[in-house]
Design a protein with these regions (language model features):
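Short, flexible, basic/aromatic active-site loop/helix in glycosyltransferases
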Residues: 135-174
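A conserved acidic beta->alpha catalytic loop
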Residues: 17, 39-49
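Conserved donor NDP-sugar-binding/catalytic core segment of glycosyltransferases
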Residues: 98-130
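Active-site-adjacent helix/loop segment of glycosyltransferases
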Residues: 207-261
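Short, well-formed alpha-helical segments that are part of the catalytic scaffolds
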Residues: 14-29
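A short, conserved alpha-helix in the catalytic core of glycosyltransferases
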Residues: 166-167, 175-194, 198-226
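Glycine-rich, basic loop-to-helix element that forms the pyrophosphate-binding segment
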Residues: 64-81
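Short aromatic/hydrophobic "clamp" motif used to bind/position activated sugar donors
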Residues: 86
Length: 261
């Protein structure tokens, strides 16, 4: 859509929920000219790509010849886009149109906000605590350690790390939001060069937030909009994803300094 206001960017790789997600987007948005959907496929299987082609009536789809990761795909979709706002959108998110419209209205009203994130829910309606106030090695140890007695000993620290005390009655400035759903000013995304695509997956969203903060840009959480996220916690279950997570964590701390506690 040449005159769209929002570019909605989705990066896929054999994504489990994508077709349910795309059906939801068709139902919610139809061919609304305010929104342009751009999908970047990271060399999924032939069968998957053939199914994805069925949605070329609602989205511009790039089928790439190799998998260079999450940040690379979103940069490909967005760094040359002309829309005012960019929406980084996971292929496992269910969105109601009115929730996005409320977020756009917030950015329209307050030009000091660079990045806006909503409340993220599980399929059962409970909250996913994905916002972070800090990033430290010890906090990641606590998240991954399998012993509940250790988690209980540091329950207060984990609650603080996961920002479990965020208000439900007002928007609030935060330090780090989740890349599963980020509404950004296009200019600010371009000014920082988009995502650092040296991260294949994981930590590129944290890195983007730190880059924005370094430039005194505001990142805000709104509890008045919500999305449903079919969160897989892949790094907790899959050894290959855990290795990717650890590599990205190493890159992050090498770039921003090692914070142990």
């Amino acid at each position: 859509m040449a005159n769209a206001k929002v570019a909605i960017s989705i990066v896929t790789y054999n994504s489990k929920h994508i077709f349910k997600v795309l059906e939801n987007l068709k139902q919610e948005f139809g061919h609304d000219p305010q929104f342009r959907f751009v999908i970047f496929d990271n060399n999924s299987t032939d069968d998957y790509q053939n199914r994805l082609k069925e949605y070329q009536d609602i989205a511009d789809i790039t089928f790439y010849h190799e998998n260079n990761g999450f940040g690379f795909g979103h940069n490909y979709n967005l760094l040359h886009a002309s829309e005012k706002y960019f929406l980084v959108f996971n292929p496992d998110i269910i969105l109601v149109r009115d929730d996005l419209l409320k977020m756009i209205e917030i950015l329209d009203r307050d030009e000091t906000i660079s990045l806006l994130v909503p409340k993220v829910l599980n399929a059962d309606g409970t909250t996913q605590h994905l916002i972070r106030d800090r990033v430290s090695v010890f906090d990641y140890f606590l998240r991954f350690v399998p012993f509940q007695i250790v988690k209980k000993m540091f329950a207060g620290r984990l609650a603080s790390y996961e920002c479990r005390d965020l208000p439900d009655d007002r928007n609030v400035e935060i330090r780090i939001g989740s890349g599963c759903f980020m509404l950004l000013r296009g200019k600010d995304f371009k000014d920082v060069g988009g995502f650092d695509d040296r991260y294949f997956m994981y930590f590129e969203d944290y890195d983007l937030c730190i880059e924005l903060k370094k430039r005194n840009k505001r990142i805000v959480y709104t509890p008045f909009s919500n999305v449903t996220h079919y969160y897989e916690r892949g790094a907790h279950k899959n050894s290959n994803l855990f290795k990717i997570f650890m590599k990205s964590m190493y890159k992050y701390f090498n770039k921003w300094g090692w914070k142990w506690f």
